UniProtKB/Swiss-Prot annotation:
Name used for this protein in its record: Putative cell agglutination protein pfl6
Listed Gene3D superfamilies: 2.60.120.1560
Organism: Schizosaccharomyces pombe (strain 972 / ATCC 24843) (Fission yeast)
Gene: pfl6
Annotated GO biological process: flocculation
Main subcellular localisation: other
Keywords: Glycoprotein, Repeat, Signal
Length: 416
């Protein structure tokens, strides 16, 4: 065989093997000898692409062409030559459209030479899809989570139904049960989350001495009989001692029997270092009903006096004589001197999603003070009040502190 023919033969063999080497494939190197038939095996591995959208993974398996075998017969001259194998590309990228958001998937490759396909989902944010149910459209929003980033699924129902947000911390591939989900209602319009309060000095001169400075060493709780005074034009409400708003994630600290005010935000340390004698705290908020049921208000540790109003009169018109709940510090023959006030009050039966106006006035005379409360029902159990509290709803809001009462004049009848 002359040199030209030999070179041409080697070139064709190499070109043949090059054509049979494909992405992700492997081929063996063989020695070609005279008068001998040899086989070169070219094989491609199987690739599996996993697409995940929402909670239902979809798996697509891509099979290469079957393994090919080719017989090559050489001339009588003995020689050997390497088979050219193209190495696997390091990264294969495929762009897929999900809704209106592009994202890139990469697929782990298999074979002798490894390749990695990176999965790049949209930057943490939201993907929104509008769905129509009957004649009422509603929107579902999926906020994508990764690692320890908090993930949220918000379901916005038609406006005549309430909305629920299920939120929790999730890992990239973790699924958590409903028992770990915190259920917090979401406003169906422009409601503002929060529970407002204001703290005042007690300055009603006609009863201050009996309430704040008792002569016999014991506060006269019945001397505090004008709760609507805290909401009148006669009381200077322009400069309360403290004001604040509890957010939906704040817990209301229990005001256990103490010489000091409770540590409410945003000035918790200042309040906690202020003596509570002769002080009044006013609370106002809308309670959003989580489930249709009959609800009860439970108050504990009342020291010294508590008044409560529910419904529209809690926004404007509350008076000294139309309160819905009342409790006070008192002695109990069965429990001994110093028993604090407590009580359960039926608020009423309300439908899911209803915003109930609520107003409390809590006053402490001499010595230590205290107050604690929560709402409950058979279907929900005790509620975390701030998780269901709003400073205003789509159609209603509270007046500034110091406005809106409906009956300053005329004290309450003495209760015993």
């Amino acid at each position: 065989m002359n040199f030209f023919l030999y070179f041409r033969t080697i070139f064709l063999i190499q070109l043949y093997f090059f054509n049979y080497s494909t992405f992700g494939c492997s081929a063996s190197s063989t020695s070609v000898q005279s008068d001998t038939t040899n086989q070169v095996s070219v094989s491609c591995p199987k690739y599996t692409t996993i697409y995940t959208s929402g909670t239902s993974p979809d798996t697509k398996t891509i099979y290469p062409e079957s393994t090919s075998t080719k017989s090559i017969t050489t001339s009588t001259q003995s020689h050997s030559s390497p088979v050219i194998v193209v190495s696997t590309v390091g990264t294969v990228t495929e762009t897929t459209i999900s809704g209106s958001t592009e994202y890139t998937t990469t697929i782990p490759a298999e074979g002798i030479t490894s390749g990695t396909v990176e999965i790049v989902e949209p930057t943490a944010g939201t993907v929104t899809e509008t769905i129509t149910s009957g004649t009422l459209p509603f929107t579902t929003t999926l906020a994508q989570a990764s690692g320890t980033v908090s993930g949220t699924v918000e379901i916005v129902s038609p406006k005549n139904n309430p909305t629920t947000v299920y939120s929790g911390t999730v890992a990239t591939t973790e699924t958590f049960s409903s028992s770990t989900v915190v259920v917090i209602p979401t406003a169906i319009c422009d409601g503002v989350r929060g529970l407002e309060y204001a703290v005042y000095d007690y300055t009603i001169s006609s009863s201050m001495n009996e309430f704040c400075y008792p002569k016999n060493g014991q506060t006269d709780v019945f001397a505090f009989n004008e709760p609507a005074y805290f909401g009148s034009s006669d009381l200077d409400q322009s400069s309360p001692l403290f004001t604040g708003v509890f957010s939906s994630t704040d817990d209301i600290p229990e005001w256990a029997s103490s010489w000091y005010l409770p540590p409410y935000p945003p000035q918790a340390s200042d309040m906690a270092s202020t003596y509570c004698a002769c002080k009044v705290i006013v609370y106002q908020f809308f309670l959003r009903i989580p489930e249709t049921d009959t609800y009860t208000l439970v108050v504990n540790n009342v020291d010294d006096v508590f008044f409560g109003w529910f419904g529209d009169k809690a926004i404007s018109g509350w008076s000294n004589n139309n309160f819905d709940a009342y409790s006070y510090w008192h002695e109990s023959p069965n429990m001994g001197l110093g028993t604090v006030g407590m009580g359960n009050f039926t608020v009423g039966n309300y439908p899911e999603g209803y915003f109930l106006p609520v107003r409390f006035v809590v006053a402490n005379g001499a010595y230590i003070g205290g107050f604690d409360f929560y709402f409950t029902s058979d279907s929900t159990g005790p509620l975390a009040t701030t998780s269901y509290s709003y400073t205003k709803t789509c159609t209603q809001q509270f007046l500034p502190f110091g406005q809106g009462n409906g009956g300053v004049n005329g004290p309450t009848e003495k209760l015993s």
